């Protein structure tokens, strides 16, 4: 769908869709999840904003899909056969997790496309589903002077957790927590912590 979308869009046109993507078991699903989407977008004349709102391991993902597609009404043997088939397929593909979220695209005109599409990847939002103006702002901020004029602010519910080895002046682990919304917790480096706190 994403690869074919630009041919159906006028310059400046947008596409917003829910999406799921497989994350290889060799990658951290919280910090290295965007490679698959990057491959989908490679060479397309679009700017993209991608948000991963949730991550499930293959077993939980399979259970969710079977349950949502009538699993409770299935005979036990049919359920187990479907469940096993999905898990075997994920194992063969080397899938360690499945990311779920949304993708927003804006079709570039010829001049913009010549310089290549811009992409922004986010782990989650501040607890609300993006509306049209959110998507328009996010995609517009990827281009030209707007990018340098963008002022990033920390949501008021974000808190930092620090873990120290007793007697050590520097933290061994930093975790940012979202107090509201989806309640995400994300391990971060000291550089990311400094930027968020600035």
Language model: regions and residue ranges:
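Aromatic-enriched hydrophobic runs in primary sequence
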Residues: 11, 58, 185-189
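Substrate-binding/catalytic lobe of Class I Rossmann-like enzymes that use SAM or dcSAM, i.e.
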Residues: 16-129
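A short glycine-rich, Lys/Arg-flanked "PGG" loop and its adjoining helix->strand segment in the class I
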Residues: 1-11
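Acidic, low-complexity/disordered tracts enriched in E/D and polar residues
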Residues: 110-197
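Generic hydrophobic/packing signal
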Residues: 13-16, 192
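Generic recognition of flexible, low-complexity loop/linker segments
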Residues: 4-5, 89-93, 183
């Amino acid at each position: 769908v994403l690869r074919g979308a630009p041919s159906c869009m006028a310059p400046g046109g947008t596409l917003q869709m829910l999406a799921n993507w497989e994350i290889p078991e060799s990658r951290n699903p919280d910090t290295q999840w965007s490679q698959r989407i990057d491959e989908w977008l490679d060479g397309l004349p679009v700017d993209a904003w991608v948000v991963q709102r949730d991550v499930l391991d293959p077993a939980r993902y399979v259970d969710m899909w079977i349950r949502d597609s009538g699993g409770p009404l299935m005979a036990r043997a049919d359920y187990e056969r479907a469940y096993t088939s999905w898990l075997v397929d994920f194992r063969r593909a080397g899938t360690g997790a499945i990311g779920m979220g949304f993708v927003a695209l804006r079709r570039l005109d010829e001049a913009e496309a010549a310089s290549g599409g811009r992409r922004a990847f986010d782990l989650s939002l501040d607890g609300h589903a993006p509306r049209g103006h959110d998507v328009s702002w996010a995609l517009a901020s990827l281009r030209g002077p707007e990018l340098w004029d963008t002022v990033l602010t920390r949501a008021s519910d974000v808190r930092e957790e620090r873990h120290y080895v007793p007697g050590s002046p520097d933290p061994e682990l930093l975790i940012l927590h979202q107090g509201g919304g989806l309640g995400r917790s994300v391990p971060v480096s000291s550089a990311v912590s400094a930027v968020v706190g600035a």
